[in-house]
């Protein structure tokens, strides 16, 4: 999965410099969010997040916050428990 996140980091960079439209990035973002709902992916991210760009780390941390908020408000009943 680290390879996927390396690709996501590159895609986020391309989005930030204007090579990807917002709707393209949001499609990637939905994939990232669905992956992060799996506990082993969350662990992988926690163990290797520092090897990604600061901007991408911030974006993923925002996605993690969204997941936690969704779980707290009962919007994701089947989501793996997020620490």
Which role does the model predict for each range below?
Residues 1-83:
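Amphipathic alpha-helical "stem/stalk" segments
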């Amino acid at each position: 999965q680290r390879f996927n996140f390396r690709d996501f980091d590159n895609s986020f960079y391309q989005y930030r410099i204007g090579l990807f439209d917002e709707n393209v990035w949001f499609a990637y973002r939905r994939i990232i969010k669905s992956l992060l709902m799996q506990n082993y992916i969350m662990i992988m991210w926690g163990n290797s997040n520092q090897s990604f760009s600061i901007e991408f780390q911030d974006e993923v941390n925002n996605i993690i916050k969204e997941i936690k908020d969704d779980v707290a408000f009962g919007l994701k009943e089947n989501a793996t428990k997020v620490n």
